[in-house]
Regions:
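Short, structured beta/alpha segment
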Residues: 1-94
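Short glycine- and Lys/Arg-enriched binding-loop motifs that mark or flank ligand-binding interfaces
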Residues: 13, 93, 123, 143, ...
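Short beta->alpha linker loops
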Residues: 43, 95, 106-110
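Long amphipathic alpha-helix in the N-terminal Rossmann-like dinucleotide-binding domain
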Residues: 53, 75-86, 100-126
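Short linear capping/connector segments at secondary-structure termini
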Residues: 91-99, 130-135
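Conserved small-residue-rich beta-alpha loop and adjacent elements
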Residues: 128-158
Length: 158
């Protein structure tokens, strides 16, 4: 999907595998010329609940995957970002007013680098041994995917 297609589509949120609209929208302003480059939906509490429930459903299957399987998915995301870096960089330029060089650095190096790093993170997090209270005990803690985390944060970037 190219930038023109992304910017020209009806405002919607991707929740649980489907595009979901909203009653309210807001413009995305190009800081370079103050033109409206897109319109985005304004999520409400109902959308947040939908997203949370979709994430809970997805997490059950995700939690059953092995660390290497989860890593394969994250590596694929990194590869997809790299493969589409020019289109993504153009979106960053239009939305944030960054130079194309800065935007390419983010989507060509930084973002895929984060995904690639976390793709191998599971191998480093194998667990921990602790000294037991009794001589005939062994205490081992194993990290596993536990559940869904919701974070709603103000995003004021750059």
């Amino acid at each position: 999907m190219d930038v023109t297609t992304i910017l020209g589509r009806e405002p919607a949120m991707y929740i649980g595998g489907s595009w979901v609209g909203a009653d309210e929208t807001r413009p995305v302003i190009n800081p370079a010329d103050e033109s409206v480059i897109a319109t985005v939906p304004e999520a409400d509490a109902g959308h947040a609940e939908q997203a949370l429930e979709a994430a809970r459903r997805a997490q059950r299957a995700w939690g059953r995957k092995s660390g290497p399987e989860r890593g394969t998915v994250l590596k694929a995301v990194a590869a997809a970002v790299r493969a589409n870096k020019e289109e993504l960089a153009r979106l960053v330029v239009a939305e944030q007013g960054k130079t194309i060089t800065e935007a390419r650095g983010e989507v060509g190096d930084a973002v895929p680098g984060f995904f690639a790093y976390y793709a191998t993170f599971e191998r480093a997090q194998v667990g921990a041994m602790f000294a037991p209270d009794e001589a005939n005990e062994q205490l081992f803690v194993r990290s596993v995917p536990y559940g869904v985390v919701v974070g709603i944060i103000p995003w004021n970037y750059p």
